[in-house]
């Protein structure tokens, strides 16, 4: 059974190598969207089906970090699949450990091999770069992003050319994503996918397969 990591703000900041903290006067801008938990459930079931190496799957989801946890929609689902979930956020949404700026952390939680989050869209590039700085070779970073995140010359040069995109897990149907966690009852007009990043394998050398990202479809 999954356990939520407990600790005070100081212990969390120390654990993640972060010296700066959030202050009550800070408030989030409008870049706050939450995903419907049923869509997270579909994704986690999809991963469980597609990771053929059961031992690696268990290692990957032993300790999971959600660094932009918001109100906990992702964390609460992942807790059913992981041994431990550490939930942090810069802002106080009433869930997890607040005042933790992911971009200022210098180390992972102990035994963490997986970061999974729905990052602020305006900071998507920075989240990817920082996650790749923190993660060891066999670890993974999963980010929920607009499918259009694949496009753009600048992004190609800054992200895809230098990082290792392992897979794209696409929702073939529209999922519910709520601004400021306000359920309007309508599905999002945006198409979403989970982008899976990881470092190049140690024996990776083929120039002919420079960007071997796989495409998966998430079925209900």
Where are these regions (language model features)?
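Class I S-adenosyl-L-methionine-dependent methyltransferase catalytic core
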Residues: 1-220
């Amino acid at each position: 059974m999954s356990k939520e990591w407990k600790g005070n703000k100081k212990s969390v900041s120390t654990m993640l190598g972060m010296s700066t903290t959030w202050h009550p006067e800070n408030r989030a801008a409008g870049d706050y969207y939450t995903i419907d938990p049923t869509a997270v459930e579909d994704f986690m079931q999809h991963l469980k089906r597609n990771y053929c190496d059961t031992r690696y799957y268990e290692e990957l989801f032993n300790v999971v970090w959600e660094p932009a946890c918001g109100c906990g929609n992702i964390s609460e689902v992942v807790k059913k699949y992981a041994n431990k979930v550490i939930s942090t956020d810069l802002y106080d949404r009433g869930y997890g450990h607040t005042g933790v700026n992911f971009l200022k952390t210098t180390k992972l939680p102990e035994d963490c091999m997986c970061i999974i989050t729905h990052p602020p869209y305006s900071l998507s590039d920075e989240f990817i770069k920082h996650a790749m700085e923190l993660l060891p070779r066999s670890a993974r970073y999963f980010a929920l992003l607009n499918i259009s995140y694949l496009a753009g010359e600048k992004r190609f040069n800054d992200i895809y050319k230098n990082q290792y995109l392992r897979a794209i897990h696409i929702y073939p149907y529209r999922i519910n994503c709520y601004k400021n966690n306000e359920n309007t009852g309508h599905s999002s007009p945006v198409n979403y996918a989970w982008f899976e990043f990881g470092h190049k394998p140690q024996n990776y050398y083929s120039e002919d397969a420079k960007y071997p990202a796989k495409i998966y479809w998430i079925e209900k």
